[in-house]
Structures are given as C-alpha cells and as structure tokens.
C-alpha cells in the first residue's frame, strides 16, 4: 500500500497544486508522502510562494523536518484556503463522504477542510467502502468533562462507544485541543444527516464524518489511479 500512497500523492500534487496557493495540510501516513513530494517540488523551484496551514502537531513536525515554513496564526486568514489536501480512513465514492479521525486530528482537519475551496483527498484502495462504518468506527471529539454524558446518550441510542486509549502512555488519548475521543461503531446510512445530528449534542466538539461541498478524490484501484 505504501507505493499506492506515493503514486496518488504525486498525482494529486502534479495535477492540483499550483504556485501562490494557500494550502491546508492534513494528517496521516498518506500526507507524509505528499509533504515529501511537495518538498522536492519546492526545492526544485517548480512550486513557489506556497503558504501552509497545518492540522496537527504531527504535520508541523513533518513540515519542519523538510524545512518547509508553515503559518501558525490562523487569525491572519480572511478568506478560504485554495485547497486542503488530506487522507481518509474510509471513503464512500458515490456521495464523496468520508470518515476521518483515526489519527486524532479530525477537529482541526475539518476546520481547515471546510474553510477551503476544495478538499483534495488522496487514498489507497483499502479506504474505499460501500458504506461508512464498514471497517472503521466513527471518531467523535468530546470535551473531557462531557465524556460521561455523551457515552450515556450513545448507550441510550444502542451504539457502542469506546474511549480511545493512548498507545504510548497510560490513559485516554488527548487531542491537540485537549479533548478526548470516542470511537463509535455504527453503519452510516445518511452521512450528511448523521454529521449534522451528532453536532447538536452539547459536549461533542466534532464528528469524523466529512461532507465537503467540493471534494475531489484521487485514489488507487484496479492497478491504476482514478479520480472522483
């Protein structure tokens, strides 16, 4: 799958990213390859005057490692970004709906994505599903003091929710925004309706279902790169 990620990252950048753009940069393993290729194009001079807006501390680290400067102060923005480039955990091609958030950064990923003219998704073939929730749970970022209330609400809806535990240390995963993450097992019949419904719960900061109005998907399938 690593080769597929490299191929789609290079294709997407070659076909969509132009000099003088304001870019949102997502989080995840596929984005790692996008950053590496962006670095090559910047150093060669084929891409110039790009401004980068990041979605996580991990992405900031990767950009710094490639000596790519990024913007830390979002308050300077007074218009939408040109493109947000990101990966996905699951993709429903027919509706261009996504699950994101297994990397724990979906709140800022959605802030960047929904304030960009285009959301450009790059993915290998394992991310394509016929129904959201087939392989992955739905990540929900929750205020720490609200986690008990939210878990009770989800149980009343007969949904199985698990508090995400950090692999590197004892205790729950804490996001860059100092919140917890609940992973909810459910098959999503109506992605747009589900996204809107869960955002009504006090204490839920963001749900990892994405329905951007202008999503472009570059993915690998059947031994070739495809677009949707």
UniProtKB/Swiss-Prot annotation:
Associated pathway: Carbohydrate degradation; pentose phosphate pathway; D-ribose 5-phosphate from D-ribulose 5-phosphate (non-oxidative stage): step 1/1
Keywords (A to Z) from UniProt: Isomerase
Binding-site positions, substrate: 27-30, 86-89, 100-103, 127
E.C. no: 5.3.1.6
GO cellular component: cytosol
Catalytic-site annotation from UniProt: 109 (proton acceptor)
Pfam families per record: Rib_5-P_isom_A
GO molecular function: ribose-5-phosphate isomerase activity
Residue ranges crossing the lipid bilayer per the database entry: none
GO biological process, alphabetically ordered: D-ribose metabolic process; pentose-phosphate shunt, non-oxidative branch
SUPFAM superfamilies: D-ribose-5-phosphate isomerase (RpiA), lid domain (SSF75445), NagB/RpiA/CoA transferase-like (SSF100950)
Catalyzed reaction equations: aldehydo-D-ribose 5-phosphate = D-ribulose 5-phosphate
Gene3D superfamilies: 3.30.70.260, 3.40.50.1360
Cleavable signal peptide: none
Its job: Catalyzes the reversible conversion of ribose-5-phosphate to ribulose 5-phosphate.
HAMAP family: Rib_5P_isom_A
Protein family: Belongs to the ribose 5-phosphate isomerase family.
Assembly and interaction partners: Homodimer.
The protein's name in its UniProt record: Ribose-5-phosphate isomerase A
Annotated source species: Borreliella burgdorferi (strain ZS7)
This protein's encoding gene: rpiA
